Amino acid sequence: MSRIGKQPVKLASGLEAKLEGNKLIIKKGQDEKVIDTKGVVKVNINGDELTFEPVEETKFAKAMWGTVRALANNAVIGLTQGFEKKLEINGVGYRAQVKGNILELQLGYSHPINFEIPKGITITVEKNIITVKGSDKQQVGQVASEIRSFRKPEPYKGKGVKYVDEHIIRKAGKTAKK
């Protein structure tokens, strides 16, 4: 029995939901999110509330029950508030700037790194903080992870790109012989 799947999802004002075959479509104006129910989760639309239940008693259906509910909830939050991740750049000469739809990073390599910003994502840079915003939680996390992967923080001085709330475990350097 899924504890997450049992909980209903409230639709905020301005959102509309509809079913097309095995797909749940949540819409706000021109922006829409499509969630595939894989045919094993039944979605009930009652006014401004979505409820979910498995169609069959298989292990896969029970697993997808909570997953589909969580994806629908993330779609509602994404369309109303949006998601954001903040990254911090630490290091001498490390910097970032946005040029059109390209994020240009200088991270101590012999060349700048040009990262193309995907559709649906906005990136802003203030001093050494990169903010990644969007309505799709998975895409925001993926883009932030890709930016971090260009120069992960190293454990000795903490130089690199890290999440703002991430704690880097520091190591002591080598000690000199007597």
From Swiss-Prot:
GO terms for biological process: cytoplasmic translation. GO terms for molecular function: rRNA binding; structural constituent of ribosome. It comes from the Bacteria. GO terms for cellular component: cytosolic large ribosomal subunit. The keyword Glycoprotein does not apply. PROSITE patterns: RIBOSOMAL_L6_1. This protein binds to the 23S rRNA, and is important in its secondary structure. It is located near the subunit interface in the base of the L7/L12 stalk, and near the tRNA binding site of the peptidyltransferase center. Part of the 50S ribosomal subunit. Belongs to the universal ribosomal protein uL6 family. This is Large ribosomal subunit protein uL6.
